[in-house]
From Swiss-Prot:
Signal peptide per UniProt: none
Listed name of the protein: EF-hand domain-containing protein D2 homolog
Domain called EF-hand: residue spans: 69-104, 105-140
Domain of life of the source: Eukaryota
Lineage of the organism: Eukaryota, Metazoa, Ecdysozoa, Arthropoda, Hexapoda
InterPro entries given in the database record: AIF-1_EF_pair, EF-hand-dom_pair, EF_Hand_1_Ca_BS, EF_hand_dom, EFHD1/2
Gene: Swip-1
Pfam families: AIF-1
Chain sites annotated for binding Ca(2+) 2: D118, D120, D122, K124, E129
Residues involved in Ca(2+) 1 binding: D82, D86, E93
Compositionally biased spans, kind Low complexity: 1-28, 206-217
Region ranges (Disordered): 1-29, 191-217
Length: 217
């Protein structure tokens, strides 16, 4: 394995960051890739089983709400950031992904993102767990300002094509649209609540009138 060839491969990736930040990020990412691959090789040499890319699951049947094309797109995105090629996104890979999406997270924020979908508590995100992010987003189970929600929304566009600013504009437009929708629903609920109060008041006035009328009968 050649470090120079890996470095060349890493530098060929399109970048949406500034030259200086990209150099630092790529260098850190390359170091992480090499360290992770070294860990895998040492484990295999020591006779320790290394968990491979996929569990025995069928994501197409486990996630019927997504079409095959959607799942293939999610797989492509997952593979892009699974730089160690071990079938998981660890904290460093997730950090790199969020930076590329233009939504960098704190260390604690990244750990919280992983914990929210980490079914087997291994501290990493498998592809199945990655799909859980989009299931939760589709079901409205993610906080609008959470890291996972940002990940789900930002991956709806191709950041490599539109750039970080374009993706952020898309995400902000989505948020604004949702806020408008929520405001509309709030207004409807307020009107319904007002009508309910008016009906209760009318019913109460009728009852009071009937009670007073009964006194004079």
């Amino acid at each position: 394995m050649s470090v120079s060839s890996n470095a060349s491969s890493a530098s060929n990736k399109d970048s949406v960051d500034s030259p200086s930040s990209t150099t630092n990020t790529d260098s850190s990412e390359l170091t992480h890739i090499l360290n992770r691959r070294q860990e895998i090789m040492e484990s295999q040499e020591a006779g320790i089983e290394v968990r491979r890319t996929y569990k025995v699951v069928n994501v197409y049947t486990d996630f019927p709400e997504f079409s095959r094309n959607q799942i293939k797109d999610y797989q492509k995105t997952f593979n892009t950031y699974d730089t160690a090629r071990d079938g998981f996104l660890d904290l460093q890979e997730l950090k790199f992904m969020m930076e590329k999406l233009g939504a960098p997270q704190t260390h604690l924020g990244l750990k919280q993102m992983i914990a929210e979908v980490d079914e087997d508590n291994d501290g990493k995100i498998s592809f199945r767990e990655f799909l859980l992010i989009f299931r939760k987003a589709q079901a409205g189970e993610l906080d609008s300002d959470s890291g996972l929600n940002q990940l789900a929304r930002l991956t709806e566009v191709d950041v490599e094509q539109v750039g970080v600013s374009g993706a952020k504009n898309f995400f902000e437009a989505k948020i604004e649209q949702q806020l408008r929708t929520n405001k509309f629903h709030d207004e409807i609920r307020a009107e319904q609540e007002e009508r309910r109060r008016e009906e209760e008041e009318r019913a109460q006035r009728r009852q009071q009138f009937q009670q007073r009328a009964a006194i004079f009968q």
